[in-house]
Amino acid sequence: MSTEDALLTGHDLVLAHQERAVVDGVSLSLRAGTVTALVGPNGSGKSTLLRSLARLHKPREGRVRLGDRTVWGANALSGKEFARQVTLLTQHRPTPSGVSVRDVVSYGRYPYRSGWRGVDVDGAAAIRRAMDLTGVTLMAERGVDELSGGELQRVWLASCLAQQTSVLLLDEPTNHLDLRYQVEILDVVRDLANEGVAVGVVLHDLDHAAIIADEVVLLSEGTIVATGDIGQVLTTGHLSQAYGVTVHVANDPVTGAIHCRPLGRHSPRPA
């Protein structure tokens, strides 16, 4: 994967939980205006890799760079400097009690605050836009402890968008969402990339990756099986190797997008 125009890069990363390596020698780059999807079976290292790019999991070996700055060690960016440029939506976040949706979304502006100063005009506009994009404006004054899982997912995403970073990292952003909001969130992600944001997103749904990704990184057992554009990576051979099940890949007759279907013993067979 080319490092041209790369905003965030991982080089030869070895990531471990305790003594066990869960990512072994992986390199990747997130480029401006590009959606890079990380796909693969459970336990393949996707979320750990994303957390390392977000400076939440220090590599045993290798390095992460944001532009020409290192993320750890000498000359590393400060926490606020990093947070002004990179944000991460994780899969699991604690649900705060006694705070409103607006409060949680406003928290995305914390890298820009100093002392007791509140949100400035630009920050208020960013909060409004983030809530509009994720469809949570009408619930702004509701307590977040009253929300469903899907509603809460959209609120946390709005908080990330309010941060206005050049790099957006998303771990399963369509989790818990019904079909309408899955489509809307995927559209938002694509729109942000079209505006120049570098997006790295973990997805379990291969069809979602086919819809929005420019580049795909297919992982299995902590290593890269294939990387490249959708057509290069989402193939029967690569997917069957990574997932350990036969995967039929075809173009949707209506949209033309690649469609991936795993074939079990009772699955209808393609003609």
Region spans (language model):
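Conserved ABC ATPase signature
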Residues: 118, 143-147, 151
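ABC ATPase NBD Q-loop/coupling interface
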Residues: 63-81
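The feature captures the beta-strand-to-loop junction immediately N-terminal to the Walker
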Residues: 39-41
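ABC ATPase nucleotide-binding domains
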Residues: 242-271
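Catalytic Walker B motif of ABC-type/P-loop ATPase nucleotide-binding domains
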Residues: 168-172
